[in-house]
């Protein structure tokens, strides 16, 4: 694999820094005005984080398909990780994969699987009886997964770890 994992780290840091700067400017403006466009700007910033997370996973899937010469890059990567007894990484990767599916498709099998594991996930998911992550937070957008800076960074981190593990598999001729 080429340096996608390095680029995704840099891209994520750059994007989050730019979004943090924009959010700071909007929050400053909200000190003197509660105009709807300012609230919408906060929501747009939150939505952009979700778009970044979904996009990085989609691009990683395409790379895996090419590099592993398969039709389901995520499944093959999981198999290779499991074959090398890297089950913790495989499980974490799968949790983020499922979260991305929930962001893309909403409630369904992926959501149901995550709800069953809600207490042990490295991110928050709204449960069936919850409407918000933080009631009164005007920046919150309707996603079933809480997509904050940590979630986006963790997406980039798990992609990097999986890419490095797969490079080690390929380097050792263990494919």
Question: What are the roles of these predicted feature ranges?
Answer:
Residues 1-55, 87-91, 98, 115-175:
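Extended intrinsically disordered or low-complexity regions, especially N/C-terminal cytosolic tails and loops
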Residues 20, 61-72, 98-115, 164, ...:
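Charged/polar positions within long, soluble alpha-helices
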Residues 43-77:
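Short, contiguous, well-structured surface segments enriched in hydrophobic/aromatic residues
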Residues 76-118:
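Short, mixed-charge amphipathic alpha-helical segments
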